[in-house]
Each structure stands twice: as structure tokens, then as C-alpha cells.
A protein has these predicted regions:
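Active-site-adjacent structural elements that line small-molecule/cofactor binding pockets in enzymes
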Residues: 1-308
Length: 308
């Protein structure tokens, strides 16, 4: 199990955010991920570029860049440029986002999202590996050359929760990034589907990067209240609601990793046994002293990382 952090707070100032990455690099975490939120916060790829200039070792990921607003040729160029600036440590997470975001906010058509991702990923993968593409599909016709000096290929992970997206992630990608997915859903739905798809395509076993809210705390009630309040909207979006229903739970508080050190460690090991390869910790500030709460969770994850 690889352990890292994810920032899902769009209000975090950029200098503070970069300092978190610098500290995570020093503390030995495997990766740090930047959420790309639709309505607030910083651009994920630009954040990776900036963090890459100030860190030495840690993998830097996007979770996740939306595909509909960007032509695949443009995203490939942006990502290859970011790979150069990040010193070859980029992990590109991308996804189709959600119908209300794409159609209501952006004014675009959320047309055939699975086919859009299949073709989009095929184009981007070919461009980063070969530097050129000649693709004729049902949704995209792309012919172009891309030369980004000093760049190199990087892993591409797909935000995949449904059967079609999991098949695409396994057949064409390097893994998936999940959010609000619990142990039961990992074991019965996510992992079997993506692993079977990768095996059928002759690809290596995919990464299963599981992002969840986490708090090491003795006040479980306060932690559950925080997660239920702050992450309420995720329980209302169709894609997340489906996996919460598969899990058989009411909302985000029921899949969050909460409790004291012993309880949280057991929870993380259970997720790993269910097939999680990477944990992306969205640390929650709980109680009257948020800084102390975050520090306790960070220290626990740091110590757990040393044991793995």
C-alpha cells in the first residue's frame, strides 16, 4: 500500500498548498494529488508544475482533470509540459466529470461519456507515447504531431466508478482514482472489473487509488458530523450516489476513514486487502483545534508509511 495525500480544499492559498507538498516530500509520502474542482481552487496541472519545481522525489498527481472542456491534443501538450516541469513525476488523473457540471455550468453536451473517454484516452496515450496521432473515431477525428522537448511518458489514471469506465481504465489506462468508494464496493465491484479488463488487454495490474476523507480522532461523532456536512454534495451526485448505494450506506460519513489510530489503521488495511494499491488521504480538521487535529492525522500517516 502506497500512502499519499490529496488536497480537496479549493480555499487553500497556493503558497500554503505548495508547502504541504514540500513537507510531504520530506516526510516520505509516496504521492500528493491536486483535486481539480470545477468552481473553486487552482488548476491542477499548473499546481503540479509549481510543486514539481520545489520537490525532489514525490509523485505529483491530478485528481482529476475534466476531459470535456479540453481537446485531447491540448491536454496532451499541457500534461507533457507539466511532466517536464515536474521532473518526470506526473501522474495524470482525468475524468468526464458530472452531467450537471458539464451541461449546466459549461454549456457543453455530456454526450456518450464512456465513448468520449475511450477515444480521448486513446488519443492522449498515443500522443504521449509516440508524439503523433492519426485517429478516426465516432466522436473525435484527430491528426497531429506533438513535440515537447525533454518530456517523457507518464501514467494515466481514469476516474472510473461504473462498469464501462472501469473497463476503459483497465484496457487503456494505468489504473483508476476513486472517491467515496468503500471496502465492499472495492472488493465486489471496482477491483474485479478493472483487473479483468487489464488482464484481457494484456496490460499490467492497474493501480487502484482510493481517495477518502480521513481523521484520526477520539471524537467519532464530531468527525462524522464534519464529513457529512462538508461532503454532503457528493452523496447527491449521481455517480457517487451509485457507489454509495452499492456499499449500502447513507452518505460520505459512512465510508470515511475515522477513529483513533488503531481503528484507522485497521480500516486502511481492510481497504488494502480489498484491492486498494494507493491511499489518497483527504485530511479533515476536527474539533476546536483544527491544526492539532490535522497534525495528529498527518503524524499517524507518516508513521504508517514508515511501516509499509
Amino acid at each position: 500500500m502506497r500512502i499519499g495525500l490529496i488536497n480537496v480544499n479549493g480555499a487553500t492559498p497556493i503558497n500554503e498548498l505548495i508547502q504541504q507538498v514540500v513537507q510531504a516530500d520530506k516526510d516520505g509520502f509516496d504521492h500528493f494529488w491536486f483535486a481539480h474542482l470545477p468552481f473553486n481552487g487552482y488548476d491542477a496541472l499548473m499546481s503540479v508544475s509549481m510543486a514539481g519545481q520545489q520537490t525532489n522525489r514525490i509523485e505529483l498527481g491530478t485528481a482529476v482533470v475534466p476531459t470535456y472542456p479540453r481537446h485531447p491534443l491540448i491536454l496532451a501538450q499541457q500534461a507533457l509540459t507539466t511532466q517536464v516541469l515536474a521532473g518526470g513525476r506526473l501522474a495524470l488523473g482525468m475524468g468526464v466529470s458530472h452531467k450537471p457540471v458539464v451541461e449546466n455550468a459549461m454549456g457543453l453536451s455530456y454526450h456518450r461519456p464512456a465513448q468520449q473517454m475511450r477515444e480521448y484516452l486513446s488519443i492522449v496515450r498515443t500522443l504521449i507515447n509516440d508524439g503523433q496521432v492519426d485517429f478516426n473515431g465516432e466522436l473525435f477525428n484527430v491528426k497531429g504531431v506533438l513535440d515537447v522537448p525533454g518530456s517523457s511518458p507518464f501514467p494515466i489514471l481514469v476516474a472510473a466508478l461504473g462498469p464501462l469506465m472501469l473497463r476503459i481504465a483497465g484496457e487503456l489506462g494505468d489504473g483508476t482514482i476513486t472517491w467515496m468508494v468503500g471496502q465492499k464496493t472495492l472488493e465486489s465491484h471496482i477491483v474485479p472489473r478493472i483487473n479483468a479488463a487489464a488482464e484481457s488487454a494484456g496490460r499490467p495490474q492497474p493501480r487502484v487509488c482510493v481517495a477518502l476523507p480521513i481523521a484520526v480522532t477520539d471524537d467519532l461523532a464530531a468527525a462524522r458530523e464534519y464529513v457529512a456536512r462538508v461532503y454532503k454534495r457528493y452523496g447527491e451526485l449521481t455517480n457517487y450516489r451509485r457507489v454509495l448505494d452499492i456499499e449500502g450506506v447513507a452518505g460520505p460519513a459512512d465510508v470515511a476513514v475515522l477513529g483513533n489510530e488503531e481503528q484507522v489503521e485497521r480500516h486502511l488495511h481492510a481497504l488494502a486487502e480489498a484491492g486498494m494499491t494507493d491511499f489518497l488521504a483527504a485530511i479533515c480538521p476536527i474539533g476546536d483545534d483544527p491544526a492539532a487535529s490535522v497534525a495528529r492525522t498527518w503524524a499517524f500517516l507518516k508513521s504508517l508509511k514508515r511501516k509499509t
